[in-house]
């Protein structure tokens, strides 16, 4: 039985956010790197760097700070498709989170992308998670 690396990323970020940690360390795979790049581009995390320790690579992510307030952003990350129950959608039925304020991360034939990119490309895929 394999590990669910996507759920591990989301849980690590959620736990660090609730515990008011500034950084989170995630095991580096191709999928995790692509998801973290999307989170960085969309502004949910502030900085990412790759770290090597005993021939294993890790991604060290700095979480986004609130301006003019103490604490972190309240980011909600929800895993949708999981190894036991895959959820697929075509590009017309990709859900909109909070009227477009949140993002949906999809795994498509063109790679991992957000819901906006998938709608522009006109392709659907597996719905990995919701973030808002």
From Swiss-Prot:
Keywords: Chloroplast, Plastid, Ribonucleoprotein, Ribosomal protein, RNA-binding, rRNA-binding. It is found in: Plastid, Chloroplast. It holds the Pfam family Ribosomal_S8. GO terms for molecular function: rRNA binding; structural constituent of ribosome. InterPro entries: Ribosomal_uS8 (IPR000630), Ribosomal_uS8_CS (IPR047863), Ribosomal_uS8_sf (IPR035987). Disulfide bonds: none annotated. GO terms for cellular component: chloroplast; ribonucleoprotein complex; ribosome. GO terms for biological process: translation. Gene3D superfamilies: 3.30.1370.30, 3.30.1490.10. Its main location: plastid. Belongs to the universal ribosomal protein uS8 family. One of the primary rRNA binding proteins, it binds directly to 16S rRNA central domain where it helps coordinate assembly of the platform of the 30S subunit. Part of the 30S ribosomal subunit. HAMAP family: Ribosomal_uS8_B. This is Small ribosomal subunit protein uS8c. The gene is rps8.
